[in-house]
Amino acid sequence: MHIHDWPTNERPREKLLARGATALSDAELLAIFVGSGLRGQDAVQTARDLLHRHGPLRPLLDRPAKALERLPGLGPASACKLAAALELAHRHLMSALERGEALSDPPSVGRYFSQRLRARAYEVFAVLFLDNRHRAIAFEELFTGTIDGADIHPREVVRRALLHNAAAVIVGHNHPSGNPEPSKADRAVTKRLLDSLELVDIRLLDHFVIGDGRPVSLAERGWLE
């Protein structure tokens, strides 16, 4: 059955317009980009097959556009639309950070770090530098490592913060294993960063650990006190 033969309120596009994007499943959202689907399938079934064979959603969408276009049911047009939508989401969140809006909503900052770091095959430690009104000044990836970890140097974080005339920083790093639970080493590095930044009156507002699922906030755990 073609999607046009479905009840109107169950078609992905009409459902999105009537109830909002959050009402759609992953497959329904992906189906909007798929378009007509493969021969003998509707777009939602093609999207389900894509998620089943090449998913889940995060690793599927972390692929570059050139890799997406080779997947059955997508092609160049759909791949470009997906890549453009993801980049727009990234830029939208960064613009909110630059205006200081998203910093009143810690999960949004965590999502930003997740967008930047989650697809990396090795560990990356990044810093978001903020002014005295907690607006974003710059985002920098300062340290990289292997799949097992990255060497973090608090003095370099302090040096870059002073260079940017930052009043506060938020840091984050990814766990390539996919497990976002902070390790003892993560907590130890956080304490060293906190102490080093306090010496120059710069606040460490949070440390996010990025893996599969929701980023873990060390501030939320009470580990930055």
From Swiss-Prot:
Residues forming coiled coils: none
Family from the record: Belongs to the UPF0758 family.
Motif (JAMM motif): 173-186
Single Gene Ontology BP annotation: proteolysis
Pfam families: RadC, UPF0758_N
Transmembrane segments: none
Organism domain of life: Bacteria
Key words of the record: Hydrolase, Metal-binding, Metalloprotease, Protease, Zinc
Name of this protein: UPF0758 protein XOO0495
Annotated binding of Zn(2+), by residue: H173, H175, D186
InterPro entries: MPN, RadC_JAB, RuvA_2-like, UPF0758, UPF0758_CS, UPF0758_N
Gene Ontology molecular function terms on file: metal ion binding; metallopeptidase activity
Boundaries of every MPN domain copy: 102-224
